[in-house]
Amino acid sequence: MFEATTILGYRGEFNNKKFALIGGDGQVTLGNCVVKANATKIRSLYHNQVLSGFAGSTADAFSLFDMFERILESKKGDLFKSVVDFSKEWRKDKYLRRLEAMMIVLNLDHIFILSGTGDVLEAEDNKIAAIGSGGNYALSAARALDCFAHLEPKKLVEESLKIAGDLCIYTNTNIKILEL
């Protein structure tokens, strides 16, 4: 279902300054064929205060982006309240419950995974989250690099996604990164 991408979100503090980044690869896969190598699956929302990225069906993801952005606007950028209301609305709608997409949303203070069933999952460490077919590779690499490498945040995201791209056939190394 989500065999098409890798998205990695990373937030925290580096050199006494808060940061939030999201990165994703550019590969779009249809069955066993690569149909696009430079797609953009990450976005900045609410006056560049929230970052998001998706894995799964593109049409479904854009529906979710639009819905989430509307709720985020109504909550004046409050990410926590937005994900809670988003989940409530998602679970009420029979059409939305069948969407085949996942999202990561984050700001300087929080990072969440929004699942295809309407669940909201806060990253275990409130620091690193990954989705998509290469998500576990990127998550493992990011956790190891975060603990031991002391890289700048953007470099950590880039290197973690490169590792995922080397291991996952549905992920490439055409990486795009957004940061707050």
From Swiss-Prot:
<keyword id="KW-0021">Allosteric enzyme</keyword>
<keyword id="KW-0915">Sodium</keyword>
<dbReference type="GO" id="GO:0051603">
    <property type="term" value="P:proteolysis involved in protein catabolic process"/>
</dbReference>
<keyword id="KW-0888">Threonine protease</keyword>
<keyword id="KW-0378">Hydrolase</keyword>
<dbReference type="InterPro" id="IPR029055">
    <property type="entry name" value="Ntn_hydrolases_N"/>
</dbReference>
<dbReference type="GO" id="GO:0009376">
    <property type="term" value="C:HslUV protease complex"/>
</dbReference>
<protein>
    <recommendedName>
        <fullName>ATP-dependent protease subunit HslV</fullName>
        <ecNumber>3.4.25.2</ecNumber>
    </recommendedName>
</protein>
<feature type="binding site">
    <location>
        <position position="165"/>
    </location>
    <ligand>
        <name>Na(+)</name>
    </ligand>
</feature>
<comment type="subunit">
    <text>A double ring-shaped homohexamer of HslV is capped on each side by a ring-shaped HslU homohexamer. The assembly of the HslU/HslV complex is dependent on binding of ATP.</text>
</comment>
<dbReference type="InterPro" id="IPR022281">
    <property type="entry name" value="ATP-dep_Prtase_HsIV_su"/>
</dbReference>
<dbReference type="InterPro" id="IPR001353">
    <property type="entry name" value="Proteasome_sua/b"/>
</dbReference>
<keyword id="KW-0479">Metal-binding</keyword>
<feature type="binding site">
    <location>
        <position position="171"/>
    </location>
    <ligand>
        <name>Na(+)</name>
    </ligand>
</feature>
<keyword id="KW-0645">Protease</keyword>
<dbReference type="InterPro" id="IPR023333">
    <property type="entry name" value="Proteasome_suB-type"/>
</dbReference>
<keyword id="KW-0963">Cytoplasm</keyword>
<keyword id="KW-0346">Stress response</keyword>
<comment type="function">
    <text>Protease subunit of a proteasome-like degradation complex believed to be a general protein degrading machinery.</text>
</comment>
<dbReference type="GO" id="GO:0005839">
    <property type="term" value="C:proteasome core complex"/>
</dbReference>
<dbReference type="Pfam" id="PF00227">
    <property type="entry name" value="Proteasome"/>
</dbReference>
<dbReference type="GO" id="GO:0046872">
    <property type="term" value="F:metal ion binding"/>
</dbReference>
<comment type="similarity">
    <text>Belongs to the peptidase T1B family. HslV subfamily.</text>
</comment>
<feature type="active site">
    <location>
        <position position="5"/>
    </location>
</feature>
<dbReference type="GO" id="GO:0004298">
    <property type="term" value="F:threonine-type endopeptidase activity"/>
</dbReference>
<feature type="binding site">
    <location>
        <position position="168"/>
    </location>
    <ligand>
        <name>Na(+)</name>
    </ligand>
</feature>
